[in-house]
Amino acid sequence: MTSQHRQPEQVAQHLRHSLGRLARTLRHHDDDDLSPTTASILFAVGREGPLTAGDIARRERLAKPSVTAAVEKLATAGLVERRADDSDGRVVWIAITPAGKRRIDARRARRTAWLTIRLEKLDPADVETLSRAADIVDRLIGEDDQP
């Protein structure tokens, strides 16, 4: 059966499997010791700017206690800092530090380099197909990924 004739459930299973393998492979080839949850939080704060723990929990779909524990690890490592809100002392903002930004940049560079090497071995038409597929995946997850 060709991919043109696969039912949505079959495509969903194949896509889930392939993207999961890609994510695991990228983690395996990365020497970073951050857990997936901690890395996700660091990337969110780096991407979105200062966030509260509640903001992070909603955006990353994590339990607030998990966010609190991960932020503590990131703060201890000097990758994020906590800042009190100027107008409401009860609110604590979590912001990325320069060391956190460097960590994100290095992680992205390593993973991009690994993937680029593999993409360069493919036929240009396959690279274009993967580019279009990535756009489709972005649209697919974007439907549910709104904060």
What are these regions (language model features)?
Residues 1-36:
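N-terminal leader segment of winged-helix/HTH proteins
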Residues 3, 10, 22, 26, ...:
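Amphipathic alpha-helical dimerization/coiled-coil segments
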Residues 8-12, 16, 35, 64, ...:
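Short, structured helix-loop boundary elements
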Residues 25-66, 73, 77, 93:
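N-terminal helix-turn-helix DNA-binding core of bacterial DNA-binding proteins
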Residues 29-32, 101-106, 139:
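Helical hydrophobic small-molecule/effector-binding pocket
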Residues 43-47, 108, 135:
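Short, locally clustered residues in the helix-turn-helix/winged-helix DNA-binding domain
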Residues 72-132:
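Charged, amphipathic alpha-helical coiled-coil/dimerization segments
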